[in-house]
């Protein structure tokens, strides 16, 4: 005969309030009693006791004020990613400190000096050796049409990156430039059909994009400077406001500047090499073909900063013109 199990009583589990205590106030003593697992002992580490190069938060958004090259100011929604290194014998980090450190500087007008101060703060707050901040924004510039006199806003996707590793600090700008590329081969074939057979034919062209990453050195490299540099390299930037005369002008501009993807990355590289405010760089270009069901792509790097034996699998997938 089995023994009867004891009947559970209400005292086995405390009665819990199911109402939110809006009037509850936290004092220092209560805060000191709160558990903090991320700062726990190394015995709590899960998995390999290995150092982590990047741990933090991604895509917290806030408005940041930027100065234009002409001296004006513009507030733009900015997405921020902040990470630090973590030593092998440390359990984790308090990620909210990254946000708090950044917010302490968020009301200031942006400059690389402000960004460096934010980096120093959260590196110090978290007791880390290495740290990185990346800010992503879309920067508007008014662009004139080619012939009609109209103008419209062109937006440039930009990421600013400040990183410190082993005491070496890098200031990097990633800049997306969208342009039209007319295939030189297709242009010649279309002309051949016209001349040899009186056959109307049109060359194929496509929206294309270059992501240009540069190490900034020396004097300020303005966003507007990058736009000017890219336009010198590849003149066929996509248009904003267009009337018929602008569309015709753009067709003429493309015919005057046919370009393969290999030509494009080298044209950008020539301008980047000539700019003393730019050190190492990388150009990733994608011509999103209208003839083929695939894209034509190319990568050109200068210096060690962006040189890798392996390509990120998403390096071209992330380029959507």
From Swiss-Prot:
EC number(s) reported in the record: 3.5.4.16
Pathway this chain belongs to: Cofactor biosynthesis; 7,8-dihydroneopterin triphosphate biosynthesis; 7,8-dihydroneopterin triphosphate from GTP: step 1/1
Coiled-coil zones: none
Signal peptide stretch: none
Keyword Iron-sulfur included in the entry's annotation: no
Reactions listed under catalytic activity: GTP + H2O = 7,8-dihydroneopterin 3'-triphosphate + formate + H(+)
Positions of the record's site feature: May be catalytically important: 183
Domain of life, source organism: Bacteria
Example GO biological process: tetrahydrofolate biosynthetic process
Pfam family name, one: GCHY-1
Enzyme class: hydrolase
Gene Ontology MF terms in the entry: GTP cyclohydrolase I activity
Keyword terms of this UniProt record: Hydrolase
InterPro entries attached to this UniProt entry: GTP_cyclohydrolase_FolE2, GTP_cyclohydrolase_FolE2/MptA
Function field: Converts GTP to 7,8-dihydroneopterin triphosphate.
Recorded family membership: Belongs to the GTP cyclohydrolase IV family.
UniProt xrefs under PANTHER family: GTP CYCLOHYDROLASE MPTA (PTHR36445:SF1)
Protein name (record): GTP cyclohydrolase FolE2
